[in-house]
Amino acid sequence: MWGFVDCTRYYLSLGLPKVVLHDASLVVGAHEKVGLLIPPGEGKSTIIRMLAGVEPPDSGIVLRDDGGWPLGYAGALQPTLTGDENVRNVALMVGLDPDEFSMWCADFSELGEAYFEPLRLYSGSMRGRLAFAASLGIPASTYLADDRLAVGDERFRQKCEVTLAERLQSAGLIFVASNPRLTKEACERHGVVSRGKIIECGSHEEAEELFTQNFRDNAGEEIADEELASFDLA
């Protein structure tokens, strides 16, 4: 089970709280595909980091199990190590055979000889391909996605999408995005993050309408003065 129970997360911006979540709740069951729409810069990455256990909430409970993995997550990759060394470390981290996992990642990423070079020599697109190869090679119970489900050129993106679709036949997805089209195609449950609250919607169309009307023109709006008292600004 994944999600949030009365979770609050904020950070200070120019002395005022920039709210990501404020007493927000959401429960996601096994194998569910949930899309949450949120404007750019309003906390997509923070929400994913909280679900992944990388960043704690200021208050409340984060629900998570041990079988989740952030899609395209590059935080575990070290720039001084080669692509091969990096994915072997990831394999050991999640309990997979390093040799088999490295072979899979080398084939999927299509990096050629660069696979055996240090990551600091990679371009952004090369790092993205390696990160997605590593993510899709892990048989996660739930994938956590921050605004994208694929990387690279059109052919490689299609390859990512096909492989992810295969994985999602027996796995869940929590997809936090700013593009309603992406969540429509990938998710079955839909919601919107509004002023720190997670609002569940009955359909993608309802979520898109709420997102478009209430957020695209009001991204970055500060919370009401009466709510400031609930945050410790010391």
Residues of each region from the PLM?
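A short, flexible loop at the N-terminus of ABC-type nucleotide-binding domains that lies
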Residues: 1-33
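ABC-family P-loop ATPase nucleotide-binding domains
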Residues: 10, 69-162
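ABC ATPase nucleotide-binding domain signature region
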Residues: 30-92
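Conserved catalytic/dimer-interface elements of ABC ATPase nucleotide-binding domains
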Residues: 55, 190-191
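Conserved catalytic loops of ABC-family nucleotide-binding domains
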Residues: 163-178
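A cytosolic small-molecule/anion-sensing beta-strand core signal
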Residues: 194
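Conserved beta-strand-loop-alpha-helix hinge in the C-terminal portion
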Residues: 197-224
